[in-house]
UniProtKB/Swiss-Prot annotation:
Source organism of this protein record: Rickettsia rickettsii (strain Sheila Smith)
Protein name: Putative adhesin A1G_07050
Signal sequence range: 1-22
One family name in Pfam for this protein: OMP_b-brl
Protein keywords: Signal
Gene3D superfamilies the record matches: 2.40.160.20
Keyword Signal: yes
Origin superkingdom: Bacteria
Length: 224
């Protein structure tokens, strides 16, 4: 809870600074919403050694930003994921579970607050091509479950990481004051906390997944 309050306070400070900076400039502010599909990089389960694969998750983000110049803009976004999971069934390779058939699942909860900057690389009559980058805090935790091994499932607590984002996309104006975007983003949300679980007298490491994702999103920006 304290970490969430800290993120909220950071957000308020950044927005206040942005408002003060923009008040002396004749540029428009905008609201934005983005959603789409994402997949995590493959990771190996620490306890069993099973290589986990991602399902398709839904990233969602809301934000506020402003146009600094004709070809440059910045925004602050709050984002999360819906339904993300790393999972796989197979034979364990790590002791004490070697050759045990197991199904491992890691379900993350990720909340990120990013400061983003974008620059238009080219301007065509119908659309623009842009590149961007973002950075900010992310709260990351996960629920870990195993089928085939009793007593190993666990939950990790929230960990605050620094999240990074790189973006390449295109945008087009559909009506005055409204633009749509299609973008690819790579996001690194860092690792979850590691946790040792006692299994039949043996300390077994779990957690510690590194969540990096490839995102394809559609977004819309409304001038305000």
């Amino acid at each position: 809870m304290k970490k969430l309050l800290l993120i909220a306070a950071t957000s308020a400070t950044i927005l206040s600074s942005s408002v003060s900076f923009a008040e002396g400039m004749d540029h428009e502010w905008y609201l934005r919403i983005d959603t789409g599909a994402a997949m995590f990089n493959e990771e190996k389960d620490k306890a069993t050694g099973v290589k986990l694969k991602s399902n398709t998750t839904v990233p969602v983000a809301l934000g506020i930003g402003y146009y600094i110049s004709e070809n440059f803009r910045a925004d602050l976004t709050l984002g999360t994921i819906i339904g993300g999971k790393l999972k796989k069934s197979g034979a364990a390779t790590n002791a004490p579970f070697t050759r045990t058939n197991v199904s491992a699942s890691h379900k993350p909860t990720i909340t990120r607050l990013l400061i983003n900057g974008y620059v238009d690389l080219t301007n065509f009559d119908m659309f623009d091509v842009f590149a961007g980058a973002g950075v900010g805090p992310a709260l990351v935790k996960e629920k870990i479950t195993y089928n085939g091994i009793t007593g190993l499932s666990s939950n990790t607590k929230n960990r605050t990481n620094i999240s990074y984002k790189l973006t390449l996309g295109t945008s087009a104006q559909i009506v005055d004051g409204v633009k749509v975007e299609l973008a690819y983003s790579w996001i690194d949300d860092g690792r979850t906390k590691s946790k040792n679980v006692i299994y039949q007298g043996t300390s077994v490491p779990t957690g510690g997944m590194h969540y990096q994702s490839h995102n394809l999103t559609a977004g819309i920006r409304f001038d305000i």
